[in-house]
Amino acid sequence: MNKAVRKAVIAGNWKMNKTPAEATELLNAITPLVKDAGCDVVACVPYVDIAAALEATKGTNVKIGAENCHWAKSGAFTGEISAEMLKACGVEYVITGHSERRTYFGDTDVTVQQRTRAALDAGLTVIVCVGEYLEQREQGITDELVAMQTKIALGGVTEEELGRIIIAYEPVWAIGTGKTATAEQANEVCAVIRATIKSLYGEAAAEGITIQYGGSMNAGNAAELLAQSDVDGGLIGGASLKPADFAAIVEAATKG
């Protein structure tokens, strides 16, 4: 498959970090460093930072995303935010199914599908996260599990809508631990995801979809990971809070 036809996307996932004032300061440091990026650059920020982030990135090439959304348009869901609300705020991207949402807040493959559906209906681009726990990798069921997660998350998604889907492979054992899948391990699973897309939508769709790696990518390992044939970008956690490191990853994606 021709990697050149795909769009590289580097997305920062800030998690539960930064006040609005701190978000402005961080984005003011990041935007000049990535202004010549040859890839798409996204910052997925906490809900309370969205307004400040949109203001700080106005007129730049950095797009703003959210870290989650509810599956309902509105209703008695105290503390939740709908995809339509995010769209109305000016957000362009949203993450669904992050391993921390699955681990700590009860997200399942079905609720990830529901959130993804709602986000697509609202007109957002969705970064859908899939990945295995350490015990699942040790059991040798990584490929089967990730393929299943991908199929369920994309339930009801049309080929046209697939153009607003990014799949992020995040081995859960490499999230926030400092451990990283080898470049070969990352590429193998990203290839499984692409093969799953091919089985669902055909070869052209599989060639076109962007697949990110999301397991502790940093300035030191980004170039090797992003050089892999099926890795088209990164979902960046800790390094996205460090302007120079995030910019180095963006530069690696531009070259990769």
Annotate each predicted stretch with a short phrase.
Residues 1-256:
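Active-site loop-to-helix "anion-binding N-cap" substructures in soluble metabolic enzymes
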